[in-house]
């Protein structure tokens, strides 16, 4: 997401949880420093006084990627104990797009009800599912497609997205 936003010339604000850092080290070759270097602004999770914690700070919206079930549940219940959940809460109250790229599977009924509640509040649940019609040749192409589809929800058109061209 950060690479795409940089390509598009869009300012990005990054908040990373401890769990996200563990996921980063397990699933990518990026170091935390390399990740944070991709963002325009980096905020600490505990900094609930950051700019993005206020509705008066203008943003296009927010993407939580990846979004854990824990974070999703906190957002759904209005728990704002970290900057991540506070910024998401502000995004909802200001009626800006909030895209949650929930990646846990399978879902149980509680997860689905939480997703329903969030959708009713205005959030968009967008699991990072591969678009096989795009015939991805690598994991990176699958990731880029999911990122691009999420950016579409903000009216941002990223060139890495392969668009559906109909059956051939």
Regions found by a protein language model. Give the residues of each.
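A cross-family phosphate/adenosyl-ligand binding-site feature
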Residues: 1-99, 103-168
């Amino acid at each position: 997401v950060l690479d795409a936003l940089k390509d598009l010339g869009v300012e990005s604000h990054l908040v990373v949880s401890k769990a996200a850092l563990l996921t980063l080290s397990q699933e990518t070759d990026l170091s935390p420093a390399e990740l944070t270097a991709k963002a325009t602004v980096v905020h600490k999770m505990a900094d609930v006084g950051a700019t993005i914690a206020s509705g008066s700070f203008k943003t296009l919206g927010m993407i939580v990627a990846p979004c854990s079930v824990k974070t999703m549940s906190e957002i759904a219940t209005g728990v704002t104990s970290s900057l991540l959940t506070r910024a998401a809460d502000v995004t909802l109250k200001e009626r800006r797009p909030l895209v949650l790229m929930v990646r846990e599977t399978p879902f149980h009924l509680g997860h689905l009800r939480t997703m329903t509640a969030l959708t009713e509040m205005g959030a968009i649940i967008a699991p990072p599912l591969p678009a096989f019609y795009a015939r991805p040749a690598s994991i990176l192409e699958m990731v880029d497609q999911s990122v691009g589809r999420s950016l579409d929800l903000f009216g941002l058109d990223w060139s890495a997205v392969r668009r559906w061209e109909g059956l051939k």
